[in-house]
Amino acid sequence: MEFTQVILYTDTDGRARFREQAIPLTEGKPQARLSALMPCGGLQLRMSPVGFRSEFHCTGAPQWLFVLGGMMEIGLQDGSTRLFKPGDHFYSADTLPEGATFDAQWHGHCSRQVGDEPLVTAFVRA
């Protein structure tokens, strides 16, 4: 049994992309499988109003993002988007490559609130 981790990362060309990776659920009991315990550096909650839209940016530090309410769309520089609904998650690790100067036409991702409900998210620092 495994958990699918959606990862937003910086590829070798400096662009943000999505990929998926399996996290094995090898602990716990047959009726409640668990992953290995993962360290974290803190929890932060955010509420974004209807109409929220960010500029392109990179993640400052790797973190899990869990959508608790509303819907969120993540847009990449290649024009692709991915929609996240309540209960969805992704691991945001699209940090600026070392030595690079941020270029809003090349690096990072943007996010926006979708629909008629505020976006409520939880960030868990890795």
What is each PLM-predicted segment?
Residues A61, S80-L83, T101-H107:
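Ubiquitin-like/PB1-type beta-grasp interaction modules and other compact soluble beta-rich domains
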Residues Y91, A100-A126:
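A short hydrophobic beta-strand segment most commonly corresponding to one strand
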Residues D78-L96:
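Short acidic-glycine-tyrosine-enriched beta hairpin
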Residues M1-Y9, G79:
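Short acidic, Pro/Gly- and aromatic-enriched capping/linker segments at domain boundaries
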Residues G60-D78, D88:
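Glycine- and acidic-residue-biased ligand/ion/polar-headgroup-sensing regions
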Residues P49-F52, G70, L76, L96, ...:
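Short acidic (Asp/Glu) patches
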